[in-house]
Amino acid sequence: MREQFHRVIAIDGPAASGKSSVARGLARQLGFVYVNSGAIYRAITWHILQKKIHPEERERIADALQAADITCCLQDNESRILIDDVDPGEHLRDDCVNESVAGVSQFPVVRQIVAKKLHEHAQGHDLIVEGRDIGSVVFPDTPYKFYLNASPQVRLQRRAAQGGRDEIAIRDRVDSSRPVSPLVIAKDAHVIDTSHLTIQEVIEEIVGVLEKTGLRA
């Protein structure tokens, strides 16, 4: 039987393209639940590292996740991830997580778990989900797909302003070349270059597209 989902707005794009700020602001404006799929991958990566498992040990990662209790809850209309009742939120941008998340997230078992959690969320709530494969893989049937991008220079500046140390070029290469759920533009996605737009300008463009499709808060 086909899963029945509430309304899902997919916002995909590479690192530092503005996904998080736009998705969070749009969710607040529309009254949808905001979900950062990348935070789920980062939480899983943090959990794996806490278990002293190397990011390339696929079988041990699979076993650890099979034994883990991974749940999503809501806080201020935003999704939070708990693993074995622990909220790793403050550790999601730790250097060790930054260095390992791309490797951990490429494994099919990890992506399947994240997709399952997102599907469970969508069975009970209207969602705005940001990620890299939301419109292309996780929710391919949603009519509300957006892909945000920006120039490499702008993205580097944004990441530096956030105090991050992610290697943008390396992450792009890994995201785009992985065999499972690579970063691609869904064929029916609305593409927005955010390089010279404010967050609110991007939100307004998305709202305009949504209104043309008949979606209202």
Regions found by a protein language model. Name each.
Residues 1-8:
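Extreme N-terminal, non-catalytic leader segments
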Residues 16:
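Walker A (P-loop) phosphate-binding loop of P-loop NTPases
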Residues 73, 118-125, 132-141, 161-205:
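Small-molecule kinase domains that catalyze NTP-dependent phosphoryl transfer to phosphate-bearing small molecules
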Residues 40, 134-135, 149-157, 196-198:
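Conserved nucleotide-binding/hydrolysis micro-motifs of P-loop NTPases
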Residues 11:
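Hydrophobic anchor at the beta1->P-loop junction of P-loop NTPases
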Residues 39-126, 138, 153, 165-170, ...:
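ATP-dependent small-molecule kinase phosphotransfer cores
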Residues 19:
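Conserved lysine of the Walker
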Residues 22:
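Hydrophobic positions on the alpha1 helix immediately C-terminal to the Walker A/P-loop
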